[in-house]
Amino acid sequence: MKIWVDADACPVLVKQILFKAAQRTQVEMTLVANQHIPVPPDKNITSIQVQSGFDMADDYIVEQCVANDLVITADIPLAAEVIAKGAHALNPRGELYTKESIGSILNIRDFMDTMRSSGVQTGGPGAYGNKEKQAFANNLDRLLAQR
């Protein structure tokens, strides 16, 4: 298992949890972004800067990940693509996307997008707090223990 991080919008708290987990478990981890992302000095942790552009980091992750890798992303279409390749997808709030759930999650996302396009104020997710941080850490640990 390798961890791929869609790092452009990944919260700092999540990156810190990931750095500690990668160092503790010696799992290889790559952060992918269209800007420089600093990483701690560790042979298993790397950062790759892709060209700026729509979905460039997502496309790189989809191209590189393989079955049983873990992708950290809040991007639902990216999660759907990596799940189709047999990888795991976990969002920074601790929600594990699965083959069974990703279709309905995509449908809800598309519906909300349509609502916003028609001028309806839909709001966004709540503030990122301890509950979300703990859910992420717990699911990450569970996935790493299964490898």
UniProtKB/Swiss-Prot annotation:
Highest taxon, organism lineage: Bacteria
Classification via InterPro entries: UPF0178
Coiled coil regions, renumbered to chain: none
Pfam family, one: DUF188
CDD domains in the record: PIN_YqxD-like
NCBIfam families (alphabetical): PRK00124.1
Family affiliation: Belongs to the UPF0178 family.
Name the UniProt record assigns to this protein: UPF0178 protein Patl_1318
